[in-house]
Amino acid sequence: MSTSGCKHLQLVQEVRPIADGCQECLTIGDSWVHLRLCLISGDVGCCDASKNKHATKHFHSTKHPIIRSFELGEDWRWCYIDSTFV
C-alpha cells in the first residue's frame, strides 16, 4: 500500500479499541457488516456497507482522518481526506 502523498499518517496514535463492536450500533441495538477502528481515538464504528455508517460519521464529526479495518485477517488503512489506502 502506498503511503506517498498522505500527510495525515503523522496523526496516527497507538490506540486501544474502545469497544469490541460498533459503539453506536451497540447502544441502539443495531447490527453492522464490518468494523473500522479510528487510529486517532480508538473509536470503533461500522463500515459504509452497514446501514448506519458510524465510522464515516465519526470522521465527519471529529475530523479524525485515518481508520483501519477492525476485521480479523484484514490489514489496511484508509485516509478519508485523501480518499486513499495508506
Where in this protein do the model-derived segments appear?
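Canonical RING-type zinc finger of E3 ubiquitin-protein ligases
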Residues: D30-L39
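Cys/His-rich, Zn2+-coordinating zinc-finger modules
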Residues: T3-Q10, R16-Q23, I28, V44-V86
